[in-house]
């Protein structure tokens, strides 16, 4: 059986240049991320990853916090270059001296190479030690004039998978009586619609049942609301994606999360599915039946 091809991104560069933001961005893109792995463990780590059938994209932050970094990084990279089941890309982050000094002053941290001395001396020493590694990097990003959001957007543009954009919309119905979902990005209240709960034969059913679904959908206000809601979502979703979000949770609530919210979540989910990867769930639909 042929070995699977693994993707490795090594995040390195100047201290204070944004390596943490880069790692978080790659994690959002589906990469398994490891912070501060000693270079000498890199080949052994990859042998373990090769055996895993769940991981094919790995991002490693490697920098001078590992004291052996400068002695062992080059041999480790040479060994990776000779490994045929790994595609390696080195991402090097840097920033101008003035910007790095300012960032250190804001955080009141010491530079790791000059813990008791001048921050600028530490920056200069680090820049010199990293010069060879910067030269063999496939992607160098200067973050001097970048806000964290802009760096995330740049990382997304560089590393998003070619076959499919990484953006998932999660549609969730819920009941207000059980609380608003804490992970919801957008919440819509549909308690203004006629309630099937007050019709005896529909009370034990849910919005997944045909009778309830058709009852909820027959009202003019339902159709008007759905048209406006879907139009709003189709307008705003591309902008959420542009801002670097890889997941958006949309919660639609009624009183108990049984009828109206379930029916509308199903309808909206099917509309969104035509353009975006979409997951539909009903948080509170089974609560009453379970009692």
Curated annotation (Swiss-Prot):
Q: Which SUPFAM superfamilies match?
A: P-loop containing nucleoside triphosphate hydrolases
Q: Where does ATP bind?
A: 13-20
Q: What does this protein do?
A: Displays ATPase and GTPase activities.
Which Gene3D superfamilies does this chain map to?
P-loop containing nucleotide triphosphate hydrolases (3.40.50.300)
Q: Specify the species.
A: Listeria welshimeri serovar 6b (strain ATCC 35897 / DSM 20650 / CCUG 15529 / CIP 8149 / NCTC 11857 / SLCC 5334 / V8)
What is the official name of this protein in its record?
A: Nucleotide-binding protein lwe2422
Family the UniProt entry places it in: Belongs to the RapZ-like family.
Q: Where does GTP bind?
A: 63-66
Q: Name one Pfam family in it.
A: PapZ_C
Q: Source organism's superkingdom? A: Bacteria
Keywords (alphabetical) are: ATP-binding, GTP-binding, Nucleotide-binding
Q: What are this entry's molecular-function GO terms?
A: ATP binding; GTP binding
UniProt cross-references to InterPro entries, sorted A to Z = P-loop_NTPase, RapZ-like, RapZ-like_N, RapZ_C
